[in-house]
């Protein structure tokens, strides 16, 4: 699980500020516009005194003539300032969220494979989408409310003190009480917001599992299981939402009750003779109206607190990910094309957060241009050995050498450029077939080279039958293709990459016998003059390997070529008899 540090609102906002500060000019314009907007409201209230005392009290017609023009002017200014403030704040928040998402996306993409082993895809998707939107809410809507309503409160206080400081000073007494109440509510909002974000991750994960495993759900009749699971996480989300509503609903009347008590006391104080002598109808109306008008910004600030705390809680969660260490790339050695000699020396390896060793004392040597095959039962450690060559994981002890140099001496990008991988779990992108074959290197290959690789992988047979050929968009993870077709695209990708080291991890597992024979010829051609590590369950595909290693429980228990291993009548011979029914 992702654990975020319990930071205060101020500490969290201070970390967010460097992402906002590049756009502070937009914030400044928005703040000025919001202050003008709030000043317009205050001036509107101040017009009540001349209207009542002069316009109606003394029947001064001139006041009634210029008053409408002032009102229209103030409304125009108020409307224009409202538009400017909303536009500027939305622009700033959009930029902040875009940059936050880019930074988060880039950071997650640079995390080690072990990170993805421990995190669900749904949770990470929720972080990039839902949590980022919560940041937008805190940096846009909340900011508008805080500045506008804050300016309104200041303006109204100035107006009240200007006309009657005696009555207005009473409101100073309630300020600490309101502050304490809001602080208590803030802690509750923060706690609920964190729970809501975690629950949203569970909702996304549950949905993602159903969508990805839809065929299995139908085949095994798991609709009730998935429905029940989704109902549980959805109900938890609803419960957290109701807790947020309850906290907000309780805080609103409490703060308004405090304010109304102060208002009642002001009315009582206004009846004192010493105070009444200084008041006119216009003055008491302005002061009283200002106090009533204070209710709206006070309520808005109370409500925005929940929104702001959601945003700050989301920030904490995102910062927790950004604080995680990315994949270490301490190597300095760059290499354009390796010879391809690989060697494992006394290698021991355990997966992160696991105590038991997955590989124990592994020793193997693959000379340049030779093919070594790994066989054994599922879970014996064959794929783990392959994953160490690309440094998806780092070993606990021992050495893995490429051309006589420790893998850790190479820059990761340079090392991985030397390896072409075809696994049983093929991932294709929602793009054209051509772009999938030339993935991430489209500009390096011509159309003819892409087509040649597809022909060598025996993929052009089905590609030519498609309406747009190589330009056919194949959908998410190649949903429009069969398992065998997807694997042929992956083989074409490896052929085009033309790396000196080739890893085939059950590369033909999804193919029928006829297609396997055809592709095996292409793979045999591909393996020429390359160092190849082949992992296979079908022993018929690795009989020609220069050396075969039998892996069991993380150890290499037998080694030799096909003929020699059959002659020893050991574990390999037993596997061979099981497959061929001898």
UniProtKB/Swiss-Prot annotation:
Record's bilayer topology term: Multi-pass membrane protein
Spans traversing the lipid bilayer: 16-36, 63-83, 153-173, 253-273, 275-295
Residues where ATP binds: 376-383
Recorded GO CC terms: plasma membrane
Any one GO MF annotation of this record: ATP hydrolysis activity
ABC transmembrane type-1 domain boundaries: 28-310
Domain ABC transporter intervals: 342-578
Catalytic activity: ATP + H2O + lipid A-core oligosaccharideSide 1 = ADP + phosphate + lipid A-core oligosaccharideSide 2
Enzyme class per UniProt: translocase
Keyword Transit peptide: no
Pfam families assigned to the protein according to its UniProt record, in alphabetical order: ABC_membrane (PF00664), ABC_tran (PF00005)
EC annotation from Swiss-Prot or TrEMBL: 7.5.2.6
Keywords: ATP-binding, Cell inner membrane, Cell membrane, Lipid transport, Membrane, Nucleotide-binding, Translocase, Transmembrane, Transmembrane helix, Transport
Leader sequence residues: none
Highest taxon above the source species: Bacteria
Family: Belongs to the ABC transporter superfamily. Lipid exporter (TC 3.A.1.106) family.
Annotated domain remarks: In MsbA the ATP-binding domain (NBD) and the transmembrane domain (TMD) are fused.
Quaternary structure (record): Homodimer.
Protein name: ATP-dependent lipid A-core flippase
